[in-house]
Amino acid sequence: MNESIFPHWNSDQAITFLKEWNFSLGVILLLITIILQFGYTSRSMFVYLIKMIILWLMWPLTIILTIFNCFYALNNVFLGLSILFTIISIVIWILYFVNSIRLFIRTGSWWSFNPETNNLMCIDMKGKMYVRPVIEDYHTLTATVIRGHLYIQGVKLGTGYTLADLPVYVTVAKVQVLCTYKRAFLDKLDVNSGFAVFVKSKVGNYRLPSSKSSGMDTALLRA
C-alpha cells in the first residue's frame, strides 16, 4: 500500500492527534450515545430513524476496519484474527440482508430492513395497514385510543380513529412466522377514548394479506 495514503504513525503523533480532536470526538460520541440510548419509536420517530441509520452503518464500517487490519497486522496472530473477524462480519452482514429480504417479502414494508429487530407489528385500520417495529416478542399487545389518536404499545400510529375502528386481529411478522393476536378485551373510558388488549392466538408460516389498493405501505415511515 502507498505510505502517503496510509502513513505510519508513532505514539507522539497519535497523542497529538487525540489532543487536537479530543473535544470533537467527545461531542460526536456523546451525540451517538444519546441517540442510541433514547431513540425509541414511542418518543421520537425522527431520532429513532437516525438511530437506525447509525446501527445500519456499524457493520459496513466494521468490515472496512477488519479488512484494513488484514493489511496492517502487527504479526501473524493478529493477521489470523483479522481474517477471522472479517469473515464473521461479512457472514453476519449477509445474513442480515437475507433475513430482511425474507421479512420484506412477508410484509412488503421497508421496516423489514430495521437492524434493531425482526419483529414487525401490523395493524389494519379502516383499510390502511400500519407497520411498526417492536423489540420484544410480546404475548399481549395493547391498543389505546385517546381523543382520536391511536397508539399501539405506546407508539402513535395515526389520528381520527375510534374504538369501533379497532380490528379483531393484529399480527406481528417475523422472518420465520406470522403471529396473530386476537382482541380479547375492550374498555371504553369515554366517548373518544379507550383501550383494547390483543392476545397471541395463532402462529403460522404465511404472508401478510395484501391491501395495496388501499395504500397499505405508502406511509409506513410516518410518525
Swiss-Prot record:
GO terms for molecular function: structural constituent of virion. The keyword Glycoprotein applies. Residues 1-20, 73-80 are virion surface. Residues 42-51, 102-223 are intravirion. InterPro entries: M_CoV (IPR002574), M_HCoV-like (IPR044362). GO terms for cellular component: host cell Golgi membrane; membrane; viral envelope; virion membrane. It holds the Pfam family CoV_M. It is a multi-pass membrane protein. Homomultimer. Interacts with envelope E protein in the budding compartment of the host cell, which is located between endoplasmic reticulum and the Golgi complex. Forms a complex with HE and S proteins. Interacts with nucleocapsid N protein. This interaction probably participates in RNA packaging into the virus. Component of the viral envelope that plays a central role in virus morphogenesis and assembly via its interactions with other viral proteins. This is Membrane protein. It comes from Human coronavirus HKU1 (isolate N5). The gene is M.
